Amino acid sequence: MMMPELVVALDYPESEQAVAMAARLQGSCPWVKVGLELYTAAGPDILRRLKDMGFSVFLDLKFFDIPNTVRGAVRSSVCAGADMVNIHLLGGARMAQAAVQGLQEGCECKGLAAPPVLLGVTVLTSMAQQDLPAGLDLPLDSVVDVLARSGREWGLNGVVCSGYEVESIKKSCGTDYICLTPGIRPAAADDDQRRTMTPQQAARAGSDYLVVGRPVTGAADPAGAAYSIMESVRQA
């Protein structure tokens, strides 16, 4: 079993809280995630601050717009320092290919030899079968598989998906196709997520990155919680 990397979600309404938590996490995890709430409040400067602290940054904004807008947004994200970005695969081929172009342009802007990771969002882990739009008759896992295979064809590096779909995605898209799994919970509680897994389950399924938020950031010792999660994966 390959060891996945831990990504801690900094889901805060302003930058100082996020930076304070990041300071407590230094040395315990390689990645942090900046989502819509924090990025809207803090802007691109939060990426610089986190990278100056030694973290790789997953900018989780799930771009979904007309192709030219997404191209520019991805380019700007890379220029701002994002190491991983994502788009909604439901945006289709032209939007995804524009995102790939924006990624390349961002690399030129930053002088990067290796491009950041570009992922496609399949179906949110907060959704279950009954949450899919009326008229979409495919089983949820089939929707995920179709979107994942499309992302591969369009030039993306991988997908954001629940742990339940990782094994089938790896089979249909190849073991080098990255699977980043949110909704990771050390215990049974699922909060606002539906399709959750423990770190051990997701690692055994083949996830490459595990996104954990409140179980780490809400702990009395966040760094200790991060270490414990990864130790549980090593022993799985």
From Swiss-Prot:
CDD domains per record: OMP_decarboxylase_like
UniProt GO molecular function: orotidine-5'-phosphate decarboxylase activity
Pfam families listed in its UniProt record: OMPdecase
Active site residues per record: 62 (proton donor)
Top-level EC class: lyase
Example GO biological process: 'de novo' UMP biosynthetic process
Enzyme Commission number(s): 4.1.1.23
Binding-site positions, substrate: 11, 33, 60-69, 125, 185, 193, 213-214
GO cellular component annotations of the record: cytosol
InterPro entries, per the entry: Aldolase_TIM, OMPdecase, OMPdecase_AS, OMPdecase_bac, OMPdeCOase_dom, RibuloseP-bd_barrel
Quaternary structure, from the entry: Homodimer.
Family per record: Belongs to the OMP decarboxylase family. Type 1 subfamily.
Matching HAMAP family: OMPdecase_type1_B
Entry protein name: Orotidine 5'-phosphate decarboxylase
Source organism of the structure: Oleidesulfovibrio alaskensis (strain ATCC BAA-1058 / DSM 17464 / G20) (Desulfovibrio alaskensis)
Species classification: Bacteria, Pseudomonadati, Thermodesulfobacteriota, Desulfovibrionia, Desulfovibrionales
